Amino acid sequence: MMTHPLLPKLRQLKLSGMLNTLDLRAEQALKEHLAPIEFFTLLLDDELERRSQQRLANRLSQSGCHAQKSLAHFDYSAVPGINRTMINDFATCAFVNRHENILLCGPTGVGKSHLANGLAIEALKQDLRVFSRPVHRMLADLHAARASGGYPRALSRILNCDLLVLDDFGLQALSPSAIQDLYEIISERYEQGSIIVTSNRSFEEWHEVFCNELLASAALDRLTHHAHLLVITGESYRQRSRRKEAISKAQMPNSSS
């Protein structure tokens, strides 16, 4: 990096985006005969991009999403039944602005959680507030927060986010208090905030999760109103990977022969 009186000033102002690209932009300005205002605009754009990426990283960390499970990394060829055009439409996050829900059902390993996580990342990119947790963990955390006096704050994060992702709905049995908490969350967010739900259970089995027909009917009525239901079929990613690995090993030449 070149030595210039500007460098310590950029460091003092914490303009690391401009600092990191200053040499590159100075060289570009000379080669392309850029006007000073054009050169400065490029540096400002670099700083804005750096801050945008930092905000996204912070929101990812706070949201509970997994950075590596983005839509860009989703293997659509492995799940041919998925309507990619529909997923791309969801990725615009218009459904969040309309306070609509997305319900993803299907067997283990077909990409439900990956899709939900990928859509949540797209929401984060649009500066939307996201809270993502497996259902049983979210409810366990609420129970612990109630005991420690932090329940109002913990509940507020769930209720006030723009997009709530409830992963693995119905995977584990819930206590009566957890069921009540889940119902209240769904009820409070009705037409106020979007929810994405993933579940290994068929939609027809979702009533069983609540162990109370009245609560189940009320909760699912709110959850399914203004909702998009996607039933995903196919073979588990993990099973397919194990089969490919077994085939690959079987085709390897025997070194002892």
Give the label of every model feature segment:
Residues 82-160, 207-209:
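Conserved P-loop
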Residues 1-5:
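A conserved P-loop NTPase coupling/switch region
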Residues 163:
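Walker B motif beta-strand of ABC-family P-loop ATPases
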